[in-house]
Structures are given as structure tokens and as C-alpha cells.
Amino acid sequence: MHKIIRVLALVYASSVSDTAMVQAADHQTKPTIVLVHGAFAESSSWNDVIAQLNRHGYRTIAAANPLRSVAGDAAAVSSVIRSLQGPVVLVGHSYGGPVITEAAHGKSNVKALVYVAGFAPDTGESSLSLSGQFPGSTLSDALLPLARPDGGKELYIQQEKFHEQFAADVPAARANLMAATQRPVTEAALAEPSNAASWKTIPSYAIYGSADRNIPPAVMKFMADRAHAVKTIVIDGASHALMVSHPGEVAALIEEAAKAP
């Protein structure tokens, strides 16, 4: 009886070890997903997307975006990319789009760019210049500008307008938490021209909502078409915060980008 138990224990241990080795090997072959939040948000906005990606075996990093300047913010994300081995998929929401576009420049391990209601600027374009190309944004009326010591402006969305403006399809209780924890962006960062257009050489994917009030959907369609995005998804009725309201669809597109040859 004791011999049988010992044999079963050895078989079980071997099975667990083999499973762990397979899982470890699978984890190493999959790209690391680096997610970059935009203005008026913070890293936890990716939580539900991360949960799904982690369940499917992906390593994920929600990078802290300083929201100070495109060049400086891209440098911060670039330092994260340089620390990683193997392929990387960069995901940017809103103003995070210009940041990943610049951060990916010259990085041979970045295999895809995923724009989640994000700007995909060409060289010389800014978030503000792109947003103004088509009508539809109501963001300017919802902003709360605060003076900076250097004479510039720090921009928030007024808390009482946050739900309707930024996250209309998110439950009110959660939208109120997002409003309270939002991180401001400098006005200068939104007006800063991009120095790179990595989507010209790296496959890109786009997903956005038809009811986005921050970035006109027509702008996002224009950018996706111009970049010849591998796949573009438009979620009917989705707000600017679709990584919160539609994490399943966002995660699925990221996985598709990660699995592409």
C-alpha cells in the first residue's frame, strides 16, 4: 500500500512539474502587453482588461504615464520596453496613443500597436490638432484648468461632468471613483507635436466607441484608415472609457494583435 502511495505521489509530482514547465514555456513565448493610460485616467483603468489577459497567460504591465509631455512620457515608457525581453505589444488609450507611437520608435521588439480610443498622430501632429479636424468633441467645456508655477496649465475634467463626458456607459458609482482619482495632463502635452509615426512601420489595431465625447469618432476612423489598421472595431454606444465599459472586447483585440505572425 505504501509503495502504491509513493508511486502515485511521484506520478502526481511529475504531472505538476510538467504542467508548470508547459505554462512557463507558454508564458515566455507570448508577448508582454504594456498598457499606457491617457489623460484624466490612471493605471487601474486597465484592471478588467488585465484580468482577462492574465487569465489567458499574458504578462501585463500597466505603465504609469506621467502626462507631462509627449517626449518625456514616451521616454518613461521606452525605459519599460528596454527592460523587457522578447516581443512587446503596446496599448495606448487616448493621449496614451501619441506616447506609445513615439515610444515604439526604433524598438525592434515592439510587434504591434493597439489604439484604444487613442490618438495615432503623424509626425508634427498633436492630440489637439487631430481632435479639431472633425467636429464632435465636447471636452473643452468640461475641463477644469489649474495654473502651474511655470505659467502653463494643468487640466482636469470637472468631477460633476466626468460621468457624462468621459464614461457615460460606466455605472455612476464607478465613474465617480474614476473622477476622483483622475490624473491631470498638462495643456502643453496635448499641444505637443509628435516626433515619430511608428504606425507606418509597425502593425496597428484600433478600437473605439461611437459615442465618444472626448475624441470625435470621425477622427479615430480617419487615423485608423490612414494607418491601414489591421483591424478596426467600433463599439456602438461606447464612451471614451471603453477599456472600463467593454474590457472583453478590448482584451480580445489585444490578444489578436499578440497572436498575429
Regions found by a protein language model. Name each.
Residues 91-92, 96, 100:
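Gly/Ala-rich beta-loop-alpha elbow adjacent to hydrolase catalytic centers
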Residues 206-208:
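Short beta-strand/loop motif that positions the catalytic acidic residue
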Residues 210-238:
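Conserved loop-alpha-helix segment in the C-terminal half of the alpha/beta-hydrolase fold
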